[in-house]
Amino acid sequence: MHYFEGLSFFMTLGLVLIVAFILNVFQKSTYYLSLLFSVVMVYFVFIKTPDQLIALLGFVVLGYILMQMTSKLKDRKKTMPIMVLLAGLPLIVVKVLPVFHVNGFGFLGISYMTFKLVQIIIEIYDELIEKPLSVLDYTHFLLFFPALSSGPIDRSRRFMDDWHKQRSRGEYLELAGTGIFRLVLGLFYKLVLSGMVFQHMNGPVEKDVTYLIGYMYLYTAYLFFDFAGYSLMAVGASNILGVETPMNFNFPFISIDIKDFWNRWHITLSTWLRDFVFSRVVMRFMRKKVFKKRLTTAMVAYMINMTFMGFWHGVTLDYIIYGVYHGVLMASFEWYQKKSKFYKKNKNKTWYKITSWLITMHLVMLGFLIFSGKPLLWISKLISMQ
């Protein structure tokens, strides 16, 4: 069984959501139903790969210990970086070992679970979380089945607030109706539209540069329908359970600049990076007076932030280049916004917005082409044909 794949999963999901709907209509909590199904799903998904199941359980236990230790430490300022490093260490090992042709002990969803765990640890340090989560709440948050494999990346405080929120029957029915719509739309995106696009992407790599251009457009459409489809299904299932899991996409292809794009694409990832990487790098640089100008600080922070995002996807050349590429785009646009008189004069004009949109979309699609790894394959084929 796989998350949001196959008849067996959707039949089981349908049964659980029907029970959840009935319970919510009668204003009964679905907390334990959701927790039970999340644990059961982990068992059925990983039962054929016991090494991954053991690794996942080990990660959950390690995370709980780190959370408890962080809450009890007196000098958190010195120890917090160590706790964050320990929380991220399994993911680092999983990402790095394949570079040396060694199989790691990774498991489905480790990247997303790591960010959830790091969020808890940092927010305990920031005293936004006053006391550590209970065993059940912690396990439920980490293993919440709709978002386990590919997000969206929720925050623990928001997640737990949803379970404690008292909704009227009318409020729940409105949320459930939205959830059903999102679930059906996500199914259509992922099973129909992404499948249709994928059929046109399976041809052999051709040496003509027009092949790469065509592939760039196709891959962009495929990536959106596949990933947005999964995210919609995850959010829709969450809504029917009574959880308002945050949306991951907000019409990204109407973005008029690269910052606007990252406010609309993979939103829970970009906001996580903004809150826990970018803003903290900026604060540290300003506190240490690393750079004289705030603009330089912001530009360097964007480079670090997006390069980190590339490594999070994987320690391979295409992912790293993708991260650096978006770091350059974000840093360059930051400079352009702050320094360009042309931008300040024309930014609100219709012709400028249309031109900016067209340029932004092609820069974004070029990034997706890099992300796909196809340019490296194309270059290697050209070299082999010499």
Q: What is the predicted role of each segment?
A:
Residues 1-386:
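Membrane-embedded transmembrane alpha-helical bundles that form the catalytic cores
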